[in-house]
């Protein structure tokens, strides 16, 4: 692929050559015609000035100052001495036609010119008589030798009829004299255009090199960014579109770098919190297992207490001994209830810590989402600038089209430049292709950012679920603590009843009934606690799953972050 410097140089050369061809064509057509018209106008004015000599001589004849012959000789003498533009002259012939007077070829004086023709077969003097009689004056084209030469040259003469004497006075312009004038003008213009063109090409060459360096710097930075290197920085200080691209690209890289740092930081935090959640879930499950074991113990002891109560009711003689057993069992039940309450409170503290950790993860996820949004916006800014470069490529294509039009105007001489102009259009299309490649790189960056954004959103949703589950677990633990406290109060009632049973045998029946009812209530409470423990075990398992999922997400983030070099 050709560099931008070579493309710009080729465009500059083609434009200069097109301008050169245009100047050449204009000088050989428009300027030639313009100079020819000016020369013809000068010839007309010169003939009219000489015509005044004839009028003056005729006036002298009319006044009687001179005879006609004298007046005509005076006019011929005066006109024969006039020269202009390096030996150009005037001649006089009549309407016969005969040569009246020719200052360069006097041997023609008095000759019949009706059969005189030039090498191209033009009866030039007959044409002069025809123009003079029909219009009084006009131009005639033919070939005639220059003074001091026998070679006929293309010539355009202006003739005018002097009716009083029947004379036709005329003078001519040699076409090759006009061509020499145009050639000198072409040489001067070619020299000027060449100097200017060389200067322009040199300027375009150096500008193209500067443009190429800027483009290579931007492309190199984009290639490094696409490979994950975020330590790059484009150093372009100009105030044109490339300077703006460099500024926006550096801002985008800075935002990407900040985003990756934030993601890396968040990943570490997510990994730490996921590990802590997993550890907390293990502690919670251990606590729930302890509570379950204690509940089983309480259930068994309550059953034992119920059996003892039945035995007490079946035999009053064993009341004293059984009441002591009941007191002992109730004491053990009270101690186990206290242990359960301690486990439940410890679970509450663990869940409070889990809520804080989940809130930290949620906040980090939101910050990461904000940074990703900023990076997306910067990528959109660079896409706008890339569209500006595409517009420049389109303008280059239009310039190539204009060069092709100018070459077409030059006709056969510019046919070769039409091919070059077509090549310029191809080069402009390659420039547009380069901008499309830049756009593709930006699209890859944006896809990566969007993927990170999706992962951040997923992280936020997961932390929301974790927080909801932890809060539900916390509420369930509150219920467990409340029920355990109620259970402890009921156990204290059982203890009081047992003491009353030991102290007063006469109240044994009523006390045993109260103990039986209370024991039944305790059994129900223990069953409810067991059900709550089962639910909490499910919640603890879900918390562990969330911790595992967060750990997996953290590993994925870590893999993405490790792709970048900060």
Curated annotation (Swiss-Prot):
GO-annotated cellular components: plasma membrane
Limits of the HAMP domain: 209-261
Main location group: membrane
Membrane topology: Multi-pass membrane protein
InterPro entries, per the entry: Chemotax_Me-accpt_rcpt, HAMP_dom, MCPsignal_dom, sCache_2
SUPFAM superfamilies per the UniProt record, alphabetical: Methyl-accepting chemotaxis protein (MCP) signaling domain
Alphabetical UniProt keywords: Cell membrane, Chemotaxis, Membrane, Methylation, Transducer, Transmembrane, Transmembrane helix
PANTHER family listed in its UniProt record: METHYL-ACCEPTING CHEMOTAXIS PROTEIN CTPL, METHYL-ACCEPTING CHEMOTAXIS PROTEIN MCPB
Family membership: Belongs to the methyl-accepting chemotaxis (MCP) protein family.
Name of this protein: Methyl-accepting chemotaxis protein 4
Organism: Thermotoga maritima (strain ATCC 43589 / DSM 3109 / JCM 10099 / NBRC 100826 / MSB8)
């Amino acid at each position: 692929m050709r560099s931008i410097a070579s493309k710009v140089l080729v465009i500059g050369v083609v434009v200069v050559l097109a301008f050169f061809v245009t100047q050449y064509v204009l000088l050989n057509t428009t300027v030639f015609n313009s100079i020819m018209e000016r020369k013809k106008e000068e010839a007309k004015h010169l003939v009219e000035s000489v015509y005044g000599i004839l009028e003056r001589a005729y006036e002298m004849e009319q006044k009687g100052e001179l005879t006609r012959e004298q007046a005509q000789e005076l006019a011929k003498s005066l006109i024969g001495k006039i020269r202009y533009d390096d030996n150009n002259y005037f001649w006089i012939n009549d309407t016969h036609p005969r040569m009246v007077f020719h200052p360069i070829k006097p041997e023609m004086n008095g000759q019949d010119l009706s059969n005189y023709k030039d090498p191209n077969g033009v009866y030039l003097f007959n044409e002069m008589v025809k123009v003079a009689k029909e219009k009084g004056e006009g131009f005639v084209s033919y070939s005639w030798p220059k003074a001091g030469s026998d070679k006929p040259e293309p010539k355009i003469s202006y003739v005018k009829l002097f009716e009083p004497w029947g004379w036709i006075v005329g003078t001519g312009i040699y076409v090759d004299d006009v061509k020499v004038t145009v050639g000198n003008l072409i040489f001067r213009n070619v020299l000027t255009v060449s100097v200017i063109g060389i200067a322009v090409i040199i300027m375009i060459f150096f500008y193209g090199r500067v443009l190429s360096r800027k483009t290579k710097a931007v492309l190199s930075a984009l290639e490094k960014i696409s490979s994950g290197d975020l330590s790059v920085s484009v150093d372009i200080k100009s105030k044109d579109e490339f300077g703006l691209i460099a500024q926006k690209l550096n801002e985008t890289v800075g935002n990407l770098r900040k985003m990756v740092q934030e993601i890396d930081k968040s990943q570490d935090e997510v990994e730490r919190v996921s590990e802590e959640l997993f550890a907390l879930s293990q502690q919670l499950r251990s606590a729930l297992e302890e509570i379950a074991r204690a509940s089983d113990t309480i259930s068994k002891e309550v059953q034992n207490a119920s059996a003892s109560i039945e035995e007490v009711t079946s035999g009053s003689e064993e009341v004293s001994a059984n009441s002591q057993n009941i007191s002992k069992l109730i004491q053990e039940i009270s101690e186990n209830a206290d242990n359960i309450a301690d486990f439940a409170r410890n679970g509450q503290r663990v869940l409070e810590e889990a809520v804080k950790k989940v809130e930290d993860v949620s906040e980090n996820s939101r910050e990461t989402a904000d940074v990703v949004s900023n990076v997306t916006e910067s990528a959109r800014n660079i896409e706008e600038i890339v569209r500006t470069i595409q517009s420049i490529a389109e303008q280059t294509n239009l310039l190539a089209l204009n060069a092709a039009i100018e070459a077409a105007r030059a006709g056969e001489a510019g046919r070769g430049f039409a091919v070059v102009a077509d090549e310029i259009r191809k080069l402009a299309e390659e420039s547009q292709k380069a901008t499309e490649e830049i756009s593709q790189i930006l699209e890859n960056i944006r896809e990566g950012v969007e993927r990170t954004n999706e992962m951040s959103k997923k992280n936020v949703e997961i932390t929301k679920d974790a927080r909801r589950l932890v809060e539900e677990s916390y509420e369930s633990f509150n219920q467990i603590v409340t029920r355990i406290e109620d259970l402890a109060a009921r156990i204290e009632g059982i203890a009081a009843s047992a003491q009353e049973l030991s102290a007063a045998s006469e109240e044994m029946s009523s006390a045993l009934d109260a103990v039986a009812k209370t024991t039944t209530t305790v059994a129900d409470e223990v069953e409810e606690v067991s059900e709550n423990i089962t639910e909490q075990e499910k919640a603890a398992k879900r918390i562990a799953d969330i911790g595992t999922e967060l750990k997996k997400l953290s590993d994925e983030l870590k893999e993405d972050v490790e792709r970048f070099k900060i």
